[in-house]
Regions:
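Extended hydrophobic-aromatic, low-complexity segments
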Residues: 358-361, 373-375, 383-386, 432, ...
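N-terminal mitochondrial targeting presequence
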Residues: 1-57, 62
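Short, solvent-exposed amphipathic alpha-helical segments in soluble enzyme
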Residues: 362-367, 465
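Structural beta-sheet core signal
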Residues: 141, 213, 349, 374-376, ...
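Cysteine/selenocysteine-centered motifs that mediate thiol-based redox chemistry or coordinate metal-sulfur cofactors
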Residues: 243-277, 478-522
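C-terminal soluble interaction/assembly domains
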Residues: 448-450, 468-470
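HKD-type phospholipase D/PLD-like phosphodiesterase module
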Residues: 41-43, 47-50, 56, 60-101, ...
Length: 522
């Protein structure tokens, strides 16, 4: 369903359950934001007061991006401080090297931490860094409770050494437990499948004032042959402070790992995620996130008046999605980006698991006017391809969803404007997700989304997610974004009608009959 600008602002306000985005008039009108200010004028609806404000823009073709300042905190940065790396091994090496020389903080948020040799070396490096700093480094981890507790040797066991010894007080491990997994459902659902109910999925890696944001988890595959995206943002203290605070806020309504391997619910929380009233927990947790977000927007308004902010050539906007807590922020912003892409623009969208929500499908096929290329994993590059049991059929289920989308494109006459591609690279799996936005007539993207969301039902409704929107006029950064996109699509194979008639691409009958249920959990 297409929504107008005024409907968009009201929808975000409603879905954020009372989150008020402050009036930007005192911020935008007297000051020229280099990224968005230009000779032309545009009328922009103010969310809080639902009235128009005149704002000058940087580039007439970027008018439809300035609204990001009104729905998320904006962090100015020089584009030269952003580095894109391409290989999992470089991601791991960067984490290791930066942890080795950390001075103040190491804050990691991930689905889980693996249990192999590489993961052990990472934990040992962090432990040694804390020791070398004489306890001046604060190490903080946020993982998913169920995924991090799976098996005898698990993430919790891996991190226990940090909670013992002379500097045990320097480390803390938070384990988020979804309020939706409780009672009989929690008892009967196998460990391998309980994560479909909902989990902590954010991927944030902060060392001092550097943020590495990615879709990659902390495990062997993601360090070796599982393709993802990795952005290193240096000298970004304020951005790191915000995300560090976000991790701490989620930690406030999570379990805390103890030195003996047990867990205790954070003492700052008055309600229990899986034993107390679900609504009470969800409302209390959501309030803490919304308060943080609102306060950050207010703070950015004042700080962004300074000359350093006005001279920035790049802006970063954090987007948060916590559907199980009724915080639908990232999905609304993403939907607006898709719907507002104009004729002549180009969008490149990637997801490790192709399962677009009905809103996203409608936006791409019915309202978006841009040329769209969608990249996802070929079945052999799907992370579940070599799985055992029922999980081995998951790639076939995604094939069925792809086929349904392809047929919808044909039925609506959009198969020329919207093209589907599959990543296939021998020996590799594919996990990259995000978006590259090209203005009409431009050869390089000026905006990208990078982070944890997959644009599917899980990301929107079940998991804790975050990604950042990077808007830039820095030519070198735009070139780096273009190179990143080309490297991923270099291994892409075009999807055609014949793709789905190949013998190895025809899903079993039981998949075809259960796909409606499947798509709401994966």
């Amino acid at each position: 369903m297409h929504i107008s600008n005024s409907q968009f602002w009201k929808r975000i306000l409603k879905r954020c359950n009372g989150l008020k985005l402050v009036n930007l008039q005192t911020y935008l009108k007297p000051y020229r934001i280099n990224l968005f200010i230009a000779r032309n004028r545009a009328q922009i609806t103010i969310l809080q007061e639902d009235k128009l404000l005149e704002v000058e823009m940087l580039h007439p073709k970027m008018d439809n991006l300035c609204w990001l300042h009104k729905v998320a905190p904006g962090f100015p940065i020089n584009g030269s401080k952003i580095t894109i790396i391409h290989e999992p091994v470089h991601f791991y090496g960067t984490l290791l090297e930066m942890c080795k020389f950390a001075k103040r903080r190491i804050t990691f948020a991930s689905l889980y931490l693996g249990t192999g040799k590489l993961e052990s070396e990472l934990v040992q490096t962090i432990e040694h860094a804390i020791l070398s700093s004489n306890g001046n480094i604060k190490a903080r981890f946020l993982l998913d409770y169920m995924r991090g507790s799976r098996g005898v040797q698990n993430s919790r066991k891996m991190l226990e050494p940090l909670l013992k010894g002379k500097y045990a007080h320097c480390s803390e491990v938070f384990l988020y437990h979804t309020p939706k997994l409780r009672g009989l459902l929690k008892v009967i659902m196998p460990d391998r499948f309980n994560e479909v109910i909902g989990l902590q999925h954010m991927k944030l890696y902060m060392i001092d004032d550097t943020l590495i944001i990615s879709g990659a988890n902390l495990s062997n595959d993601y360090f070796t042959n599982r393709q993802d995206r990795y952005f290193i943002i240096e000298d970004a203290k304020e951005l790191c402070d915000f995300y560090d605070d976000l991790v701490k806020r989620v930690g406030e309504f999570s379990f805390v790992l103890q030195s003996d391997g047990s867990t205790k619910l954070n003492s700052t929380l008055s309600s229990h995620p899986c034993e107390g009233p679900k609504q009470e927990f969800s409302e209390e947790a959501a309030h803490r996130i919304k308060t943080l977000f609102q306060n950050e927007i207010q703070k950015r308004i004042e700080l962004n008046k300074q000359k350093e902010a006005l001279d920035a050539d790049t802006w970063i906007f954090p987007l948060v999605q916590m559907g199980q807590l009724n915080i639908l922020h990232d999905s609304e912003v993403t939907l607006k980006l898709l719907q507002s892409a104009s004729l002549g623009a180009r969008l490149k969208l990637a997801t490790g698991y192709f399962n677009l929500t009905s809103d996203y499908i409608s936006a791409v096929l019915k309202h978006c006017q841009a040329t769209c290329d969608l990249l996802t994993a070929h079945p052999t590059a799907n992370g579940f391809f070599s799985a055992k049991g029922i999980a081995s059929s998951i790639p076939a289920a995604y094939t069925k969803i792809e086929e349904s989308f392809y047929k919808t494109c044909e039925r609506l006459g959009q198969q020329e404007r919207v093209t589907l591609w599959e990543f296939i690279k021998p020996g590799w799996t594919y996990h990259a997700k995000g978006l590259w936005y090209y203005l009409p007539g431009q050869q390089r993207p000026c905006l990208t989304l990078v982070g944890s969301p997959n644009f599917g039902y899980r990301s929107v409704n079940r998991d804790l997610e975050t990604q950042i929107a990077i808007v830039t006029k820095n030519e070198k950064l735009q070139m780096a974004l273009q190179e990143e996109q080309e490297r991923l699509f270099m291994y892409a194979k075009l999807v055609t009608k014949r793709t789905f008639s190949q013998e190895d691409r025809i899903p079993p009958a039981w998949i075809r009959t259960t796909i409606v249920l499947f798509r709401y959990f994966f």
